[in-house]
From Swiss-Prot:
This is Protein MON2 homolog. One of its GO terms (biological process) is Golgi to endosome transport. Plays a role in regulating membrane trafficking of cargo proteins. Together with ATP9A and DOP1B, regulates SNX3 retromer-mediated endosomal sorting of WLS away from lysosomal degradation. It comes from Mus musculus (Mouse). The modification Phosphoserine is found at residues 204, 534. GO terms for cellular component: cytosol; early endosome membrane. The gene is Mon2.
Length: 1715
């Protein structure tokens, strides 16, 4: 437009206009003056406009009516020259758009007049065209008039004018619609278009904008005209043809679809006018039936008219293509009509144009997709797309089934018109005859029908022949085979189009998301439709639903048609195309997961590959894919699927045997079979990824073909033609011989190409091969015929070529070999399976995987897993192969096994106990190799498995040596852990962190044994646990070795453990082991085990299971106790140490109370161990502190370390602990907590002591009596224990202790043991037990001594305990009801070793005497203690000593009473002063009578001295008696005033009694001299005398002892004198004994001394009674005068002399009497 607006263009326009006007003026000068004037005034007008206006063009347009008037007048002259000049000038104005609406109307009116006068017709058309194309000022009636003008010119008699007018009409119609489109574009920004719904109602035309209204009126009138109705708008039309109208309608619909789609008014026209019009015009075609009447008879039905019909089909094509969304129902009708026109009763040309129309649709896959969406996927709607495909199939079948008709009216187009019967066969036979039946023309031949294949179009384009014949009036002649060829191309293009489209879209989706998986049901479309309608599904799901529906809709029809064509094809290219179509459909169905349809297409190809009626079960199975005898419903007709005909018109290329169990006849293969086979191979090769389960079909077919062709698997798995011997019936032509290498090569490449399959597809391939293999194995079961090795060979081949992703197929592949082949009864097949399996495993391990195997644990495990699975096969040959394979792997790959170790170790560990010694030995060799060579190379995470496997060999009971060696291996493993601890720990921690992270990501907790201990600690714990299991093995040797190793390991390497891990060691390992050992020990069999055969003897201490378990119990308990002792500093800070301590104590207690002496004694040794007499230090380099200062005799032997002759050492060296505890500060344990532990120990000790020493209530053979070593050990524990609890040790505890000590000492010993324990009876030696008891009490009294005041109340209890022991000297304790014998009477000779034991009482005298010494010693220290005073300890001592003192010579041991009296003297020397101090308190009141009785019983004992007592001994004994009297003299009588009078009286009486010689009747005459205790008597008398003359008395109260002594002395003198007189008288001449003479002399002297003393005493101090007694002596003295002894006489004289003073009473006396 810029060119017409530029100043230059405007200037030129003005010049041209003036020039035109001048020319017009010149031409009309003479003839037409008015025109001339108008022209001249026009010039002036133009000049004026140019001068006055800047916008010249606008001004011209405004005045255009005036400007154009001269030219219109010129046209009115009807002069050709002037008219041409004017029309040219008008066109120039139009081209510059300076014509107003009015001017334009005037121009059109002028043109109309010219048209009616038939002037300048071509120029008119040109002018109209310029007017309408250059501007938009012409509207409404002016426009309609212009269009009618063109139509009128179309129907002139001049062909040139007609054709030009036709072109102009077409152009004008286009312009009208283009204007509308431009108008819409202008208004689009203001009013966005509303999309038209298919069911929209008509809107008023008045709402349309001007251009739209014009277009609407024009289109409406075109419909009117085609329908032969009068136009509403195109007024003035005189003539119109239907064909031209249809062409115009088609062009508008085709060129301006958006007009109809965007405007409801136009869409209304489409629905209400166009569609009904088309349907009406189709009426003759629908109703017409070919052959219903002859052509000569009058036709009641209007015949189809080719030009109209063909144009209608073109319109329908446009309607369908552009407006299916608007015209859902109408398009459904049109498509149904198209399908109907294919019916065999329609004219041949109609069927041809219909199939061409359908072809047009078939090359538009997007259009087909729309049909599917709009119709097939809607409920209750015609399945249009399905019907089209089925109609094509039906059409093709009809062309084969119906021979040509002989109708002369259509003979020239017959080809094969479908209406006649067999009678018309000759018409066709001529055609066949031309080729002589062996024509080389491509054709389809089926059951006598021969149809040539014509080249009708290039594939992919629908170049129609008959739809383009717009100039033809008569129906064209259709060549033979044309319809078939077009229909064939329809099928191929349909397949190509939809597969290309869907695969393209599918590719885009798959590029974004996951691929479709097999199993998506092809039946799910309807359900998906509903979902698509109701749910806002995502685009992919909707698309997938459409694809699936399209395939579902068309596959049946396609397959029916293609199968028929395949069977009928005699042309290799056509066959290739058909097979390609089937192949692409199969591949597409596969990609969409439509299993049924995929399998159907594949089955068709498979059937085509095999000879007719070949008995292949996989193809004849009753699946949805089965083709034979299947009916598909096509357009309501039941059309049988045509199976391949047996009347083969193909070249036979091979004859062979079928693959079957039963021998059958031969079968023939044709070239088409081979072609199909190649397609099948191609399908498998290129589309293996989507074959899925149909691999079964493909491979089964290939296997049979291979067998028929005689191809056999060679060593590498490739197939080669077999030897003639193998297939005597196989005959191959040269034609197929050239194909065989190719086929063989493709087969090999097929399995090689499996490396390009996706994973799912590869699985399907493997599954199919496995199924084939199973078939072959089944055949091999029942007969000796060679099995087909196809499947197994290809399994191996597939495995080897897919090694890069072997994990995908590994499980099914190896699973099949493992579960089926390796377990086949046929040993060769089994062996082959094992060989294949191990080969695959080895190949897998040597393959360079990416990432490498050491970094790909999962893959390595996968590869090795079948090796492990072979363990489940029971055939020994397979197991041997397996272990050999393991050995090979270890030797070749051992260093790089990495993560594969667990499985390799698992294979070794899987050898079961019952699998024979040789397999176990082989497996154990593998393990030994691993432990010696490969521990450093394997991942640390596998070390635990090594431990488990080694442990499992320990549990094998086939051979003891293997078990013991495996325990040795465990020790070696632990050493390895110890040496490489740091490295192993780092690696394990790293692995643990990775696993922890994975577990957290998965949201699960880490699951490993002994979690949450650190991983390195877990390794140790597993080792300990495994050794723990072996510690309870049924075999004693294994138990012993395992126990020693366990405790050695913990002892030697335990410091490597984290502190917290000790908790697990204690609870999960040690206590768990103790529990199991205790349980086994307590339930073990007591039956005696017979000595084994040969020279093996079992020691009597191990001859029952119970005794053997006892050894284990001892070892275990000792080990645990040692750990508690040596690792106490580690264990005590643990949170629940006190609970652990309690459990350990419980174990010690239960063991200590065991009836087995070995166990019980060991338990006490363990108890002693854990009490830690010496506290452990943190580092062994520190000097150990001196032991607690308690002399505890320890019976423990040196507990040298158990296990492998390694000493039990504490390895807490600085080096080891630097990394462990060095940085930690020692944990200071709470003292209270510590105290609690010791009290728990005390309670355990108390319970153990109480229960073990409790005397039996009844006596039977089963009574258990604890041994002396046990009791000794028990008591020896106390002092150490007491050091920890003394602060809280109460009186009640002391009493408990006393009970135990008393009971322990009371226990007798077995006569078996007595020779080893008892000292000889004469030795005064204590047993260890007695020593221990006294030590315990010693510890106690020492602690009390230095302890606080409140402890001293315990002294009396100590005394009581000791005094109880003292009593044993005379009265040995009784142990319950047990009968004991004296040691001398017990039998303990060695010959009676196994006789029932007797119980021997011990010699308690030394013990009692030692106890007495302790009492004295203790009393000396404690006599003054308040408690000792209050609790009458002295009285108790005296009371206790009274027994041996009264027995005196009757005591079991002479030493006892001597010690007792000595002790009494010592005790009294200390105690009497104390008693005097407390005289007033009365605390000793009860003691005096006890003392008096004791002294009385001792000094005047009833026991008789033994006969063999020597004189010296007697004298020594008498001196002891004298000492006692001296004590009385020194300690009692001087303090008489502080002592009860009764007691003093008793003393005096006793002295009186003692002072008279007593003569036992048993003395011989010779002994009387010395046996009369002369010294004793003298001492008594002297004492009496001494106290008679005590001048110290100052008060009468203090003098009572003197008075008492005098009284006793005088009485005693009187008695002696009387007895002497009597004896003298009786003796006659015989002299009296010397002692008696001495005694009488002594008495006489004493009397004289007494009287002298009395005289000297103050008179007031002498009692009158005393004098009376003295005077009473006188008559007796006088009687003695007659005695014969001179000595007596002189003494008598001295005695009588003092009596002279009594002859007169003294003065004082008188005075006293007076006063």
């Amino acid at each position: 437009m810029s060119c017409t607006n530029s100043p230059e263009a405007v200037k030129k326009l003005l010049e041209n206009m003036q020039s035109d006007l001048r020319a017009l003026s010149l031409e009309c000068k003479k003839k037409f003056p008015p025109v001339k004037e108008a022209a001249e005034s026009g010039i002036i007008k133009v000049k004026t406009i140019a001068a006055r206006n800047t916008e010249i063009l606008a001004a011209l347009k405004e005045n255009s009516s005036e400007v154009v008037q001269p030219f219109l007048m010129g046209c009115g002259t009807k002069e050709p020259k002037i008219t041409q000049l004017c029309l040219a000038a008008i066109q120039r104005l139009m081209s510059h758009e300076v014509v107003s609406e009015t001017a334009a109307g005037n121009i059109i009116n002028m043109l109309w007049q010219l048209m009616e006068n038939s002037l300048e017709e071509l120029k008119l058309l040109q002018t109209v065209l310029v007017l309408l194309t250059t501007n938009t000022v012409v509207h409404d009636e002016a426009l309609s008039k212009a269009i009618v003008l063109c139509f009128r010119l179309h129907f002139t008699k001049d062909n040139i004018t007609n054709n030009t007018a036709a072109a102009t009409v077409r152009q004008v119609v286009t312009v009208v619609f283009e204007r509308m489109v431009a108008e819409d574009d202008r208004h689009r920004d203001i009013e966005p278009p509303v999309p038209i719904q298919g069911n929209s109602n008509r809107r008023s035309v008045s709402t349309l904008r001007p251009c739209a209204k014009d277009a609407y009126m024009l289109f409406q009138d075109l419909c009117q005209l085609v329908n032969a109705d009068a136009p509403y708008w195109l007024v003035g039309m005189t003539e119109m043809t239907r064909t031209f109208g249809l062409e115009l309608l088609e062009s508008v619909l085709n060129d301006f679809p958006q007009v109809f789609l965007q405007h409801q008014e136009f869409s209304f026209l489409l629905k209400e006018r166009v569609c009904p019009l088309v349907i009406k015009l189709f009426s003759p075609n629908i109703k017409f039936r070919q052959g219903s009447s002859t052509s000569s008879s009058p036709a009641p039905v209007e015949k189809p008219y080719f030009p109209i019909c063909m144009r209608l089909l073109r319109v329908v094509s446009v309607l369908i293509k552009q407006f299916y969304s608007l015209l859902v129902t109408e398009c459904e009708i049109f498509l149904s009509l198209l399908v109907k026109f294919l019916d065999s009763d329609k004219p041949q040309w109609l069927r041809a144009v219909a199939v061409e129309s359908i072809h047009r649709l078939c090359v538009q896959p997007q259009l087909l997709r729309s049909f599917c969406q709009s119709y097939d996927m809607k409920q209750h709607s015609t399945k249009v797309f399905r019907d089209i495909v089925n109609a094509l199939g039906s059409f093709i079948q009809s062309l084969f089934l119906v021979p040509p008709t002989g109708n002369p009216a259509t003979a020239n187009q017959a080809g094969n018109n479908n209406a006649g019967g067999p009678a018309s066969a000759p018409a066709n036979s001529g055609v066949v005859g031309v080729g002589g039946g062996v024509t080389l023309l491509p054709a389809f031949e089926y059951r006598g029908a021969w149809i040539p294949i014509l080249t009708v179009t290039v594939q992919g384009s629908a170049k129609a022949t008959y739809l383009e014949m717009l100039d033809k009036v008569e129906p064209p002649t259709i060549p033979e085979g044309y319809a078939m060829s077009v229909a064939f191309h329809c099928l191929l293009d349909l397949v190509r189009g939809i597969t290309t489209m869907i695969e393209g879209e599918l590719g885009e989706v798959e590029a974004e998301g996951p691929s479709v998986t097999e199993g998506a049901s092809s039946q799910s479309s309807e359900r998906r439709d509903e979902q698509a309608a109701s749910d806002p599904m995502d685009q992919e799901t909707v698309s997938r639903a459409v694809w699936e529906e399209m395939v579902s809709a068309c596959w049946c029809g396609l397959l029916a048609a293609l199968s028929l064509l395949l069977d009928a094809s005699t042309d290799e290219a056509a066959t290739e195309n058909i097979l390609k179509a089937e192949l692409t459909m199969a591949a597409l169905c596969g990609r969409l997961g439509l299993v049924t349809s995929r399998d159907a297409f594949i089955t068709a190809i498979c059937k085509g590959s095999l000879p007719p009626h070949y008995a292949l079960t996989v193809l004849n199975a009753t699946t949805a894919a089965t083709l034979s005898n299947k009916s598909y419903s096509i357009q309501g007709q039941s059309v049988m699927m045509i199976s391949p005909s047996s009347e083969s018109h193909q070249q036979v290329v091979a004859v062979g045997q079928p693959l079957a169990v039963q021998p059958q006849g031969t079968v023939m293969l044709t070239s088409k079979n081979i072609q199909c086979m190649r397609t099948l191979l191609n399908l498998a090769h290129c589309h293996g990824a989507v074959l899925g389960t149909s691999w079964q079909l493909v491979l089964a077919t290939l296997q049979h073909l291979v067998w028929i062709l005689g191809l056999k698997p060679s060593s590498g798995g490739a197939l080669k033609p077999g030897r003639a011997v193998e297939g005597p019936s196989t005959v191959l032509t040269t034609a197929v011989m050239t194909d065989l290498p190719v086929i063989s090569n493709i087969l090999s490449r097929l399995f090689e190409s499996s490396q390009y399959l996706d994973d799912v597809s590869l699985h399907h391939l493997i599954n199919a091969l496995c199924s084939l293999s199973l078939e072959a194995m089944d055949m091999a079961y029942g007969n000796n015929k060679e099995p087909s090795l196809f499947a197994v060979a290809k399994l191996l081949e597939t495995g080897l070529v897919n090694m890069h992703r072997i994990e995908i197929l590994w499980r099914p592949l190896t699973g099949h070999l493992l579960e089926k082949v390796c377990q086949h009864p046929n040993s060769r097949m089994r062996e082959w399976g094992a060989e294949a399996l191990t080969s695959l495993i080895r190949a897998g391990l040597t393959f360079s995987h990416e990432p490498p195997l050491p970094q790909n644990q999962r893959l390595q495990l996968l590869l090795l897993n079948p090796l492990k699975e072979m363990s489940n096969i029971n055939h020994p040959d397979i197991r041997l192969k397996q272990l050999e394979c393991v050995l090979q792997i270890l030797q070749s790959q051992g260093d790089s096994l990495g993560p594969g170790w667990p499985l390799v170790l698992g294979v070794m560990g899987a050898i079961r106990n019952d699998q024979g010694e040789s397999l176990i030995r082989t497996a154990f060799q593998c393990l030994q190799l691993v432990v010696t060579d490969f521990l450093p190379t394997m991942p640390c995470s596998c070390l635990q498995i090594v431990v488990d496997v080694a442990g499992s060999f320990g549990l094998h009971n086939q051979e003891l040596n293997i078990s013991l060696t495996s325990i040795g291996l465990l020790w070696n493993i632990s050493d390895y852990f110890f040496q490489r601890g740091e490295t192993i720990e780092k690696e394990l921690n790293k692995e643990e962190a990775a696993q922890q992270k994975q577990a957290e990501e998965k949201g699960v907790s880490l699951n490993r044994p002994f979690h949450p201990a650190p991983p390195f600690d877990c390794l140790w714990l597993c080792l300990y646990a495994k050794l723990g299991e072996l510690c309870v093995d049924p075999r004693p040797a294994v138990r012993k070795s395992a126990g020693q190793t366990l405790f050695s390991t913990i002892g030697a390497h335990g410091t490597l453990l984290q502190h917290s891990t000790w908790h697990t060691v204690i609870w999960k390992v040690l206590f768990h082991l103790l529990d199991r050992v205790r349980e086994s020990s307590t339930t073990a069999d007591k039956e005696k085990i017979e000595s084994g055969g040969g020279n093996i003897l079992i020691h009597h201490s191990r001859d029952t299971a119970e005794k053997q378990w006892a050894e284990t119990w001892v070892l275990t308990l000792a080990g645990v106790a040692r750990i508690f002792n040596t690792r106490r500093y580690l264990l005590q800070p643990l949170g629940d140490f006190s609970r652990a301590w309690d459990v350990l104590l419980d174990h010690i207690q239960s063991a200590a109370l065991s009836k087995n002496n070995e166990v019980s004694l060991a338990a006490l040794k363990s108890f002693q161990e854990i009490l830690q007499i010496v506290s452990p230090v943190r580092d062994s380099e520190k000097p150990e502190p001196p032991a607690v200062s308690v002399p505890v005799p320890v019976l423990l032997g040196n507990l040298s370390g158990p296990g492998l002759s390694r000493p039990f050492v504490r390895t807490d060296s600085i080096g080891e602990k630097l990394g462990r505890c060095g940085s930690e500060t020692p944990v200071v344990t709470d003292e209270l907590e510590d105290l609690k532990l010791w009290w728990a120990a005390w309670n355990t000790w108390h319970r153990t002591g109480s229960e073990s020493t409790e005397p039996p209530s009844s006596v039977d053979e089963l009574t258990f009596i604890p041994s002396q070593p046990f009791l000794t050990a028990l008591v020896q524990i106390f002092p150490a224990l007491y050091q920890h609890i003394k602060a809280g040790f109460s009186m009640a505890d002391l009493q408990k202790l006393g009970v135990i000590l008393h009971s322990a000492v009371s226990v007798p010993i077995s006569s078996d043991a007595s020779p080893f324990i008892l000292p000889s009876y004469t030795e005064a030696v204590l047993t260890s037990l007695q020593e221990a008891v006294l030590t315990a009490l010693d510890v106690l009294q020492k602690a009390i001594c230095v302890g606080p005041e409140n402890m001293q109340i315990m002294y009396p209890a100590i005394f009581d305990q000791l005094l109880a022991f003292v009593e044993f000297s005379c009265k040995p304790p009784q142990y319950g009801q047990l009968e004991t014998k004296h040691i001398a009477n017990a039998k303990y000779n060695q010959i009676q070793l196994f006789a029932p034991a007797e119980w021997v009482a011990l010699n308690y005298v030394p013990f009692a005497e030692r106890s007495l010494e302790v009492v004295v010693d203790l009393y000396q220290k404690t006599a003054c203690h308040k408690a000792v005073v209050n609790e009458k300890v002295l009285q108790n001592i005296i009371k206790t000593l009274r027994v041996p003192l009264s027995l005196k010579y009757s005591c079991p041991s002479e030493s006892t009473w001597k010690l007792a009296v000595a002790s009494l003297l010592k005790v009294l020397s200390i105690g009497l002063p104390v008693a005097r101090q407390h005289a007033s308190s009365g605390k000793f009141d009860s003691m005096w009578p006890e003392l008096a009785s004791t002294l009385e019983d001792f000094l005047f004992t009833k026991s008789i001295p033994p006969d063999n007592l020597s004189i010296q001994e007697f004298q020594r004994n008498e001196s002891i008696d004298v000492e006692v009297v001296q004590l009385i003299s020194a300690e009692i009588l001087p303090y008489a005033n502080l002592i009860p009078k009764a007691f003093v009286g008793q003393m005096m009486t006793m002295l009186n009694k003692g002072s008279i010689h007593s003569q036992p009747c048993s003395f011989t005459e010779a002994e009387i001299d010395i046996r009369l205790r002369e010294e004793f008597s003298k001492m008594c008398f002297e004492t009496l005398l001494q106290f008679s003359f005590s001048n110290k008395v100052t008060t009468p109260q203090e003098g009572y002892i003197s008075r008492m002594a005098l009284s006793v002395l005088l009485k005693r003198s009187q008695d002696v004198l009387h007895r002497y007189i009597e004896d003298e008288r009786l003796s006659g001449k015989c002299p009296l004994p010397r002692q008696q003479v001495t005694e009488i002399i002594f008495v006489l002297k004493a009397v004289s001394t007494l009287i002298d003393s009395l005289k000297k005493t103050q008179p007031e101090n002498v009692d009158g009674n005393t004098w009376s007694q003295v005077i009473a002596l006188y008559p007796t003295l006088v009687e003695c005068i007659t005695c014969s002894s001179s000595d007596v006489g002189s003494a008598l004289k001295e005695a009588l002399a003092p009596f002279k003073d009594f002859m007169q009473p003294p003065a004082s006396r008188v005075q006293n009497g007076e006063s």
